[in-house]
Amino acid sequence: SDVCSGVTWTNNFTALSDDCGATGSATVTFTATDACGNASSSSATFTIEDTTVPSITAAANLTVQCDGAGNLGALNAWLASNGGATASDVCSGVVWTNNFTALSDDCGATGSATVTFTATDACGNASSSIATFTIEDTTVPSIPAAANLTVQCDGAGNPAALTAWLA
C-alpha cells in the first residue's frame, strides 16, 4: 500500500526448478512500485516437496514344480513382474529393484528365495514388498517294475543269482 498513489505489483517468477518429478522450488522477488517510482521488494520461496512413498500392492509368493533345470523361465518371469506387485506415485513414475541373489538348494534342483521388491520414485522415496519363490519336488521317482525270480538251489544260497537280481 502507498499513502499517495496506487501501487503496481510485479514479480520475477520464471519457472520452478524440477528437482524430481513434479516437485521443485522457486525464489521469487515481489516488487511494489508507486506512481512516483518508489519501489519496495520482498523475496520468498515457493517449494513443492515429494516425501510420500509410492503406493505398492503386495508381491505374491510363487511355488512351482521342479523342472530339473532350475525353473529359470518361471523365476525370471516372476522377478521381471516384481512378484506381481504394482506401484504408482503421485509425482513421478517408479523404478523397480529387487535383492535376489540365488535360490537356496534344499535338495537337487529345488529351493527357495525370499525377495524384497522395491519401487523408488524420482525423489528417492521407496516402498517395498516381500515374497518367496519356491521350487518344490512332489513327484515320486519312477522305477521299473521289479520282476520275481526263481532259481534252482545251488546249496550255497545262490549268491551270484541274488547279486545279479538285486542289481
Q: Where in this protein do the model-derived segments appear?
A:
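Proline-threonine-serine-rich low-complexity tracts
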Residues: 1-167
